[in-house]
Amino acid sequence: MDVITDISPLRTRLVGESSIAFVPTMGGLHEGHLSLIRAARQHRECVIASIFVNRLQFAPTEDFDRYPRTLEQDCALLEEQGVHIVFAPEEKTLYPVPQEFMVEPSPIANMLEGKYRPGFFRGVATVVLKLFNIVQPQTAVFGKKDYQQLHIVRELARQFNLPIEIVAGETVRASDNLALSSRNRYLREEERAEAIRLYQVLSQVKREIEGGNRNFAGLEENAMKILATHGWNTDYVSIRERDTLAPAQPRDGNMVVLGAARLGETRLIDNLEITPKKE
């Protein structure tokens, strides 16, 4: 496995590669990331993973300085999974000058995560486009856990006419169904035991809708009340149409319920896809 930190040697290494699958990460890898690597291996011959903590997608009050940086450990995990190349640039490599040209996503970036993390998706879209231009993969794999991000990356590829297939990887969960996240390591022991409640309330919403309940506002409100009762500071629980992420309507078919809430100092997100029974 090659670990490359600069753009020019990466491009030299990629000469002649015509079947590339790319998995961008910020490091702090766990089984969720590794499942994306395995998906990438099923699609293309050469698998590239990037490790880069992107300052542009962090607000000044967020955890950029605290975010896990475990490059040596991450590279060992990636090598075990059969990754061919790790691209691990320094910040000055991707941003040699202040990034004045930014990718401004569609209005969907201003709702849900975008509402509570202003500028987040602008930073994500900008770095993803830069990485796509550097790596030039035929396939890129993103996880469904970051559901809104996946939607925006798909729109990015479509609207910029990028010849890249965007593959969605399923959310990987711990044995108690907590969605795996690099930020889970921030949780204290008692918080880790409580953290599964986010999945539980989303599951309850899913069951209600699949059982015929169409009082979406009531379901969202009840879910947030349950979380608040147990000490969570909830940003949103929201039922959306799956393909557009517009607020769900009673006649919609495929839906998704998304939630984001803070437990202590740790902000967690999760989502569950919903397929109502046909009447």
Curated annotation (Swiss-Prot):
Q: Name one GO molecular function term.
A: ATP binding
List of catalytic residues: 33 (proton donor)
Q: Which PANTHER family match?
A: CYTIDYLATE KINASE/PANTOATE-BETA-ALANINE LIGASE, PANTOATE--BETA-ALANINE LIGASE
Which GO CC annotations does the UniProt entry carry? cytosol
Described purpose of this protein according to its UniProt entry: Catalyzes the condensation of pantoate with beta-alanine in an ATP-dependent reaction via a pantoyl-adenylate intermediate.
- A Pfam family per the record: Pantoate_ligase
Q: Note the InterPro entries from the entry.
A: Cyt_trans-like, Pantoate_ligase, Pantoate_ligase_C, Rossmann-like_a/b/a_fold
Q: Which family does it belong to?
A: Belongs to the pantothenate synthetase family.
Q: Where in the cell is it found?
A: Cytoplasm
Q: Which organism is it from?
A: Nitrosospira multiformis (strain ATCC 25196 / NCIMB 11849 / C 71)
- Highest taxon of source: Bacteria
Positions binding (R)-pantoate in this chain are: 57, 149
Q: What name appears for this protein in its UniProt entry?
A: Pantothenate synthetase
